[in-house]
Amino acid sequence: MTDYYEPTFLFRQNAIKRFSPSLSPISSVESLSLVDSNSISNNGTTTTTTTTTSSIYQNASNSSWLLNPYNVKDTAILNQSCCLNRTNVKSNYWKIPDESMNLTSMSINKNQGGNPILAISSGKSESNLFIYELNLFNNHLIHHHTISLPNIHAMKWINNTRYLVTGNNKGYAHLVSTPKLATHDVFNTNSNGDFDYNDDDEDDNNSAEICKRFNHRKHLKQNQLENTISTPIKHLNFLNNHENLLSIYNDYLFYWDIKGCHQQTRPSPISISTVSGIKNFDVPEKNHSSTNTSSANTVAICGLFGVSLFDLRDCQFNIPNYNTAQIHDKTQSSYRKLSANIVKWNPMNTNILAAGHGDGVIRLWDIRKQDSYIAELYGHNNYSITTSMEWNNNDLFTGSKDGNIIHWDLSNISKDSQWEENDNTKLPISCGLKEGFNSIEFNGKANKLETKLDQYQCGTILPASNSSIVAMCSTTTTTSSNDHDDEEIKILSIDSSSFLGVHNKVSESINVNINTNKLYYTEEDIQLLLQSQLNNNNITSSSATGSNDTLISFGNNVSQDSLVKPLTISRKPTTTIKNNNNNTTTRPTNTHTHSASIDESIVSVHNVSNDTLVNSPTRFNICESEDEFTFNYVKNNTNNEDQRQSDNRNSSFSSVSSQQTQLNNSVESLSTVVTDVENEVNHQEHKYMSLLLPVKDTSTTTTTTKDNNTNSDQAVTNTPIISI
């Protein structure tokens, strides 16, 4: 009998078999523990010391059906299903001050020559437009402005300018001039001279202003407004190098001339197209590597009708006839499979576009094969609506209402011959996740994982939020490594909990092997530590050049508030002399002239690092007033007259010191008063001061003095500098 309770075996076979090559298929559970214990005892002492970890695991419990965490084949299923192998995904989050938690849209301005500028909007009626500057290298989010522009539901920046277009829930789109930023000259000026509005008034540059208003409801007939439900402006975007504006209001697609709008008091649209059930559109980006030579007036639209191409010159739209093999009936699943709520062109190949459909599946379409899609991406929860998509070369990032962002690596799929062949009889390519329960195909007989032959595993899931992903955008940063520059993509997301997330290095996970029995550093570990320490020293020495000019130049990409670095006050070294009467005299360590200040305190200015503040080697000496001084006189065998003179001097210094001490207490000063009064002491006390040797400011030294009454040496120790 055991000393503790053991549950009975409820199952004849384990749900996940424990891997053991020495166990035959017909062996019992008891034989498994016997084999393991015999193998350890027969191998002697050497085997016992080398297998300490496994023996600890076996002695922890007699229930040998438990999985061995130190056996790779035992944990392969759990690691892949629970995404335990992912170690190189980093996310940073900031809370957006929106009490209603109703964030609606996000737009990023690349801001060539500076940090990207981020605009986040809310559906509130006031204080609902937030302008931020994002420092991607130090992961700093700097708030610049908060603007009241009620009920924003869509917006878009005009790149390299401080103008953006917003759309609200009442059918108005506004061209808004945002205030200038104090630290970015490139963002404050127009790049190519376009949209050159009057910027001579400094007061106007420091406030937001609505430059133009685009009224959508005004240009619709009264019967059209009565028969439709009023909805906000769903989506807007620029085309033709920011010369034209496209916007969706209700079931209408508006086409505006944004370049010539300043010549019109009330701008009118170029065309209005009726597209029943339209939800989104996308404009192909101009790229020299693109293989499509179609007109720039062609846009991709999606909605209840599915995915279609729209020619702005024709302004007519008819629902296409889908007679595909995949959609052959009118069931609910087929309807969801047909409808789409978001579409995005591939900037590297404008023949390819991605669409998020109502059944939660991302489908890739080739405009040269209009009868069917070419690939399906399964990763989000069933019927979870895809809210945003971003391309990065051949990588696709999708965000959904399930709170997940999935990175799809389509580099291998794009090399597949099916992408270029015009044979419509081939089935679409199926893509799944690398990790998660859906990625597991377990062979019970062989006790190992198997790869699905009919599916590419190219999706990496990132649990970005516990709520819905509202919007998403991307930006790139350039990092120098060796002799070339690498571009690293950053994915920005906002969710329904009013959090802004920045996710980087979303790539294939790295397999990190950690040896728990490792006791000593290897030669490679020492070299890595030395190299890391050398890099940190180089960064610290280069950033701490020790002048206010360097401090300002370091803060070129930050706001004025962040230029104020935190200060620390250090303790000045002092000396103490002890005698036989247990009296202590505080002596100064430095000698100064009468014109010099008596007191000095060292103020250290810290440089900003990514996560923590470290002490800078550069220190600035700031002279303080001569009032801070305390002096406790040591009684000795002298005449009364000399003692009275010394007491008078001591009282005069003490009175001045008390006033300054009260001032220091009010500001909670941490500096130690150090003064030099050698020239003020009477020549009769010179025999005491001659025993005190000068001490350096920044080092801890010890001097020896001899008392008059005894011949024993007394140690005089300087207190080292202590940073608070």
UniProtKB/Swiss-Prot annotation:
GO molecular function: snoRNA binding
Presence of keyword Cell cycle: yes
InterPro entries found in the cross-reference section: WD40/YVTN_repeat-like_dom_sf, WD40_repeat_CS, WD40_repeat_dom_sf, WD40_rpt, WD_repeat_RBAP46/RBAP48/MSI1
A GO BP entry: maturation of SSU-rRNA
Keywords noted in UniProt: Cell cycle, Cell division, Cell wall biogenesis/degradation, Repeat, WD repeat
GO cellular component: fungal-type cell wall; Pwp2p-containing subcomplex of 90S preribosome; small-subunit processome
Name of the protein in question: Protein DSE1
Species for this entry: Candida albicans (strain SC5314 / ATCC MYA-2876) (Yeast)
Taxon lineage: Eukaryota, Fungi, Dikarya, Ascomycota, Saccharomycotina
Gene of this entry: DSE1
